[in-house]
UniProtKB/Swiss-Prot annotation:
InterPro entries: Asn/Gln-tRNA_amidoTrfase_suB/E (IPR017959), Asn/Gln-tRNA_Trfase_suB/E_cat (IPR006075), Asn/Gln_amidotransferase (IPR018027), Asn/Gln_tRNA_amidoTrase-B-like (IPR003789), GatB (IPR004413), GatB_Yqey_C_2 (IPR023168), Gln-tRNA_amidoTrfase_suB_CS (IPR017958), Gln_synth/guanido_kin_cat_dom (IPR014746). It comes from Bifidobacterium animalis subsp. lactis (strain AD011). Signal peptide: none annotated. This is Aspartyl/glutamyl-tRNA(Asn/Gln) amidotransferase subunit B. PANTHER family: GLUTAMYL-TRNA GLN AMIDOTRANSFERASE SUBUNIT B MITOCHONDRIAL AND PROKARYOTIC PET112-RELATED (PTHR11659), GLUTAMYL-TRNA(GLN) AMIDOTRANSFERASE SUBUNIT B, MITOCHONDRIAL (PTHR11659:SF0). GO terms for biological process: glutaminyl-tRNAGln biosynthesis via transamidation; translation. GO terms for molecular function: asparaginyl-tRNA synthase (glutamine-hydrolyzing) activity; ATP binding; glutaminyl-tRNA synthase (glutamine-hydrolyzing) activity.
Length: 499
């Protein structure tokens, strides 16, 4: 039975939403957090294991120093307080995906303390998200429930467990309650998650592919009548693995909770799950006020000491952060705020930057990646990076246009053939005999014929109405099989109507 929902615009007028996000980022180290087991996506189940990752008696953990450095770099990017001393604790719980029956995490002494992240919204404004902590922990294995209708344990015939993921290093970034969001809660949550993805990719510490589980989020939502009231009871939607899913989870929970509260009901403190098919959250486990995981310091791991000198060395290795990079490129490329937001929303910044480095103009690179190629990617349901064309090939097409060897129509045909796998732009131009007709005599003849066939258009042009010019250019293009230079044709037409 569908849950009752309040209209979103009414819900955010009646209530003050409060959001919290717990983001799990899988680090791209070669080996696991506490053992030398390799890490690779898509490996055969239960093949990347050691006694430590299986929690076998007598096995002892050894901390991965690279994972610690990655965590510190992320802490620096999030303006966190880097704690000189931090500690690993055992988080005790029993579930089939946790072979040793406890997770090694950081409890009261995390590596990264309080910080913040400024995120840009669609209108160009900036919203500051407060960070509570960003701590290191190891991941659990992965359960696959077989026989159920939706892949969940309810109704499943049996379950399979793959421990390859057990022990993979994670950073969990926990926000403080995000207040003051008004009606922009979904947008702020999505912008924050995209900013986290961009940062960890810039730092080269995670692939951050949500579809592969490299990055996922638990989304907490609560409502209160007024910003002066105490926080309401929150729901926690677990393991949401897409940006759109996060945005829709926030919106759905605001609408669901508002309807309950408006009818005089109470919100259950529970874990929920986002169902992509129904575009709704579904109820799960009802939680007590606080889960008792019986944390205690892991006796097999000494406290982690991070010296100021080590922090300074890592600071010196920090790359340019995504927001600063976007602002720099926007100025260099002379893009407007709207143009730059279009580039970012299309996830085309890296591709355009690489294309420009290879010789294309910023405007030309943007034209291709946000035009023909974006339409092609959207039609196929894939990302721009997955298209069978690269920055070098786009830059080569732009070069051929600049050299007068291709016009817009021939360039589009060339790109279409590159996408079909027929070769490089140069090979395609040679193979198909593409060339721009620049012979003045041929163009003069084609223009004369087009003007003779369109006397009404010529009359309008002579009276100063330039809108019908396209009819003459189109006729010349047809006569030359699309190989005429449109600028040259326009010049000839203008000379003839003035003469």
């Amino acid at each position: 039975m569908a849950e009752k929902l309040m209209k979103y615009s009414e819900a955010v007028k009646e209530f003050d939403p409060v959001i919290g996000l717990e983001t799990h980022v899988e680090l791209s180290t070669r080996t696991k957090l506490f053992c030398p087991a390799p890490i690779s996506f898509g490996a055969e189940p239960n093949t990347e294991l050691t006694p430590v990752s299986l929690g076998l008696p007598g096995s002892l953990p050894v901390l991965n120093a690279t994972a610690v450095d990655y965590a510190i770099k992320l802490g620096l990017a999030l303006h966190c307080q880097i704690n000189e001393w931090s500690q690993f604790s055992r988080k005790n719980y029993f579930y089939p995906d946790m072979p040793r029956d406890y997770q090694i995490s950081q409890y009261d002494k995390p590596t990264n303390g309080e910080g913040y992240l400024d995120v840009e919204l669609e209108d160009g404004s900036v919203f500051r998200v407060p960070i509570e902590r960003a701590h290191i922990e190891d991941d659990a294995g992965k359960n696959t429930h077989v026989g159920g209708a939706d892949g969940r344990i309810e109704g499943a015939d049996h379950s399979l467990v793959d421990y390859n993921r057990a022990g993979v290093p994670l950073i969990e970034i926990v926000t403080k309650p995000i207040t003051g969001v008004g009606d922009r809660g979904p947008e702020i949550a999505g912008a924050y998650m995209r900013a986290i993805r961009d940062i960890v990719r810039a730092l080269n510490i995670s692939h951050a592919r949500m579809e592969q589980g490299n990055m996922r989020a638990d989304v907490n939502v609560s409502l209160r009548r007024s910003p002066d009231d105490p926080f309401g009871t929150r729901s926690e939607t677990k393991n949401v693995n897409s940006f759109r899913g996060i945005e829709r989870t926030v919106q759905y929970e605001i609408r669901r909770q508002a309807a309950i509260l408006n009818d005089g009901g109470e919100i259950l403190q529970e874990t929920r799950h986002w169902d992509e098919a129904s575009q709704a959250t579904a109820g799960g486990r009802v939680k007590s006020d606080a889960d008792d995981y019986r944390y205690f310091p892991d006796p097999d791991l000494v406290m982690l000491h991070i010296t100021p000198e080590h922090i300074e060395r890592l600071k010196a290795e920090m790359p340019e952060m995504p927001r600063e990079r976007r602002n720099r490129l926007k100025a260099e490329w002379k893009f407007s705020d709207v143009e730059m937001r279009d580039v970012i929303n299309a996830d085309a910044l890296d591709l355009i930057e690489e294309t420009v480095k290879l010789g294309a103009s910023p405007a030309g690179a943007k034209k291709w990646w946000l035009g023909e190629l974006s339409r092609e990617a959207n039609a196929k349901g894939i990302s721009l990076e997955e298209l069978p064309i690269n920055a070098q090939e786009v830059a080569d097409v732009e070069k051929l246009i600049a050299e007068g060897k291709l016009n817009d129509k021939l360039a589009k045909q060339t790109v279409a053939l590159v996408l079909k796998g027929e070769g490089t732009p140069a090979e395609i131009v040679e193979k198909h005999g593409f060339k721009v007709v620049s012979d003045d005599g041929m163009l003069q003849t084609a223009v004369d014929e087009a003007m003779a066939a369109n006397p009404d258009v010529v009359e309008k042009l002579r009276s100063g109405n330039m809108k019908p010019m396209g009819a003459i250019i189109g006729a010349v293009m047809r006569a030359t099989k699309g190989q005429a230079d449109a600028k040259a044709v326009t010049k000839i037409v203008m000379e003839k109507i003035k003469g």
